[in-house]
Structures are given as structure tokens and as C-alpha cells.
Amino acid sequence: MDFFKKEILDWSVYLSLHYIARVCSNSSTSHIIQDYNLIRTYEKVDKTIVDFLSRLPNLFHILEYGENILHIYSMDDANTNIIIFFLDRVLNINKNGSFIHNLRLSSSINIKEYVYQLVNNDHPDNRIRLMLENGRRTRHFLSYISDTVNIYICILINHGFYIDAEDSYGCTLLHRCIYHYKKSESESYNELIKILLNNGSDVDKKDTYGNTPFILLCKHDINNVELFEICLENANIDSVDFNRYTPLHYVSCRNKYDFVKLLISKGANVNARNKFGTTPFYCGIIHGISLIKLYLESDTELEIDNEHIVRHLIIFDAVESLDYLLSRGVIDINYRTIYNETSIYDAVSYNAYNTLVYLLNRNGDFETITTSGCTCISEAVANNNKIIMEVLLSKRPSLKIMIQSMIAITKNKQHNADLLKMCIKYTACMTDYDTLIDVQSLQQYKWYILKCFDEIDIMKRCYIKNKTVFQLVFCIKDINTLMRYGKHPSFVKCTSLDVYGSRVRNIIASIRYRQRLISLLSKKLDAGDKWSCFPNEIKYKILENFNDNELSTYLKIL
């Protein structure tokens, strides 16, 4: 069979281990017996051997042992030969005999003796023996046995196994040890990692994601200074992964002060930028003053992108760091983007409450209007943040900002009704409100009536002839049409939908009064030769430019 051909012996271990690992990762141990078919039984297998196999739980949990009989299960008949080859030819388990013919099975046998005999066994089908005699290297074997005992690794390394063998993801055993590092078992992991490092495992070898073992050591929650220093001796301190993060980026993100200090002292690039434009300094500033001081005291001048760094601090609500950098003159919070966004607007956008309070207390200007028409008030409503809304209103925003805010709010159909009511309640009490109402633009002030969605539904259910009251108030652009229905009982009833309903009635009354003035003045002017030649639309456009007092004055004169 193909699996027994000499030219593919070098791949056999990889195939078998890869298959078993894949099957194990997709199945739970509680369903092994139900999901797998019994494919081979081995008799007279000593429990010591089973204990040894159990040291590879990711590979050998598809086995059952009882009464000196080892039962092997598989659910994929097409790959059965791979498992059989691994057990029969690699581990030399004989189907009807003992585990290894020259291995004395006794209660005193230990794993070390077993491994030595496994490596040095003269059996003609000994997979490891054949590989060593032919000077071959298995490219994938070590990468799948990270859960085995360290003595096994040492023996294999001493017999010429390739220490940086890669799996299908480009990971070496050193990669996998760091990937699966557990604090609860840190002592055994530390020992194995040291063995690999001291035997020359490549700390700069990249997997398919661009991670080197050294980058992983910096990225993961491993704080062993001894391991870090061993890696640092042979590592490229400015290596990058696929996102162009360097080791210094990761130790700064993890707030590993000692590691940051070591890397900077070794000349790591403090201005290296990842693909998002972030430097290691940006990653470290959110953790407090000690790391900031370390960077500022370095010999290399830091590249500071003011807008980027302030926004980074705002996103993480790092007030302490923000205050310290301001006191050192490193940053400036008084910036405006091309969209007219400020640091206070960013604090509202990112829900950074503590930073917002800090910036407002420094007399920051929060009455900004972005190029898209948004304000800090409208942004707080969009984020559904009542606490920030209360803080902003406590700073007494102007009427201009409140009107612009509510226009922006009503453009967003998902706005929070309660927060909109807060805006209306604040705005309606301002004494100069009437002076800003443009009676020609009732449509622009629909937010004034949109205080309660339940009452809006009532408007949609009330009909005047073939139109709903909602259509008349918000959809009809012809003022004359609106005036025709102004006295209808259903329309008048809806003016009570707002606690300030009198204002709605006053607006409608003002529209009627103004139209009457324009109509009267136009008739008076028609007596003149030239005025009568103008179309009515032009006449109205001209007269619309006068306020009510001017219209009344001209009427009296004429």
C-alpha cells in the first residue's frame, strides 16, 4: 500500500498525527465510542505504554484500555491505514504480540527507558530508526507533540530531529508552546521553552499569520523575564506581523514595563507604525504615567501626531495620561479636524464621560457644528447617553446650538424620545425663542411638535377629508392649503399634543395674518402700472422679504 512505500516514510508521521489531531479536535470524548468503529485490537499492552500515550491527550484520546487490551477506534475508513501504520510501524505495536519485542514489560519500566529503546530499536520497520539512518528530517513531527514530556523532546533533539519543524499553519513547536501557554502549568512550559531556545529554535520564524515566537511571547500574558531575555539575545527586535505590529507594540499594549525598558535599551524602534498608524508610544500611554515617562526619557525623539494621540487617549478615557501629557506640553487638545470635530466632540462620540468632564472644566468650547450638521448634543442623543446629555445641558448651550441639534436629531429616525424631550424642555424655556421662529418655514420646526410618538400616531389616525392631520402639518408645503384646514376641529384638537400647544396655534395664526397682509398690499400695488405686470409668484417673493411691521406700515402709507 502507498502508506508503506519507503519514499513517503518521511511524511507518514505527519499524516497520521495530523489526521488524529484533526479528528480529536472535532469530536468530544463523551461520544467516542458511539461515533467511532473499532478497527484494531492490541493484546498484552502494558499499562505503562498506555500511560505514555495518554501524555498526548490531543492525539490519543480515541483509545480504550482494559484487561491489557488496547482498543483503537476510527470513524473514517478511508484513513484507517494511516492510524494502523502509525501504531504498527512507527510505535511498533504488534497486533498479536507485545508492544516492542525487545522491551521487557515490567512494573519498574520508566518512560525514559522506553523512549531510548524506541529510538534505538533495530527492528527493520522502526520508523525513527529508518529516518535517522537515511539522514532525513521530519518537517512536521515535533510541531504536533507539544503536550508530551520534556525528556522525550530532549531525546528526539539529541537524535537529530529538526527542531523547527512546521505544521500546516507554519507553526514550530516553539510557536505552539507559547500559543498554548498556561499559567497553571507555567513551570513545565517554561522548562520546555528553555530547552527549545537553548537548542537553537528560531525565535524569528514566522507562521502563516506573520507571528514569530518572540512576537507571541510579547503578545501573550507571559511575564517570565528569563525567557524574554533568552529570546531577546537572538531575536529581531523590530520584526512585524501581518498588521505590522512590532514586539514593542505588544509589550506596550500589555503594560509590561520591564520588557518595554529592555527593548528600548536594545534600540527598538519607538516610532514604528502598524498598518493603523499607531506607534508603540500610543499603545503605552493609556496605561499610566510610568510608561509615558519611560518613552519620554528615551534618547530617540518621538513622532507625535497630535490629533491621533489625543483621540487615542479619549477612546480609552485615559484622563490621567491626558492631563500628564498636557502638563508636559506634549499634546494640544484645541484641535479641529477637516470635519470641524473637536476633542470635546470626540469625547461625546466615544462616550468618554471622564474625559468629557475634564475637557469641559478646562473651559473647552462644546458649541461646535460639524460639516455634516451634527453637534455634541445630537451626538449624545445618537449614542443614547443620558448622563452625557445631562452634563452638556448643565453647561447651558445656546439656542442656536439647540435648534441645530434638534434638526440633526430628527433626521435620525432611531433617536431616543426621552432625550429629545429633554432637549425640547430645555429649549422651550428660553426667552428669545420667538424671535428666531421663521413663520415661512414651519416644516423646519417639526421637531418642536415631535415630542411624543404616541401623540404623533393620533395625528396619523385623524383625517380631515382625504388627508391626515400629520400630512397637513408636516407634508403640505402649500400654506394656503394648511390655512383652509386650520379651523377644523380635528386639526385644532391636535394643537394640544404639545404642552406648549399655544405656540403651535400662534404660528398658524401668524401665517394667516401675514398672508392677509401680503394679499392686501399686493392689491394696493396693483393699481400701479408696473407692479401689475409682475406675475403673482414674483410679487409674493418680493413681499415675503418684508417683516410684518413693514407690511403694515406700507399698507398704511398706500
Curated annotation (Swiss-Prot):
Keywords: ANK repeat, Late protein, Repeat. SMART domains: ANK (SM00248). It holds the Pfam family PRANC. The keyword Chloroplast does not apply. It comes from the Viruses. ANK repeats lie at residues 65-95, 169-205, 209-239, 243-272, 276-304, 339-368, 372-401. Contributes to viral release without involving rearrangement of host actin. Belongs to the orthopoxvirus OPG189 protein family. This is Ankyrin repeat protein OPG189. It comes from Vaccinia virus (strain Copenhagen). The lineage of its organism: Viruses, Varidnaviria, Bamfordvirae, Nucleocytoviricota, Pokkesviricetes. The gene is OPG189.
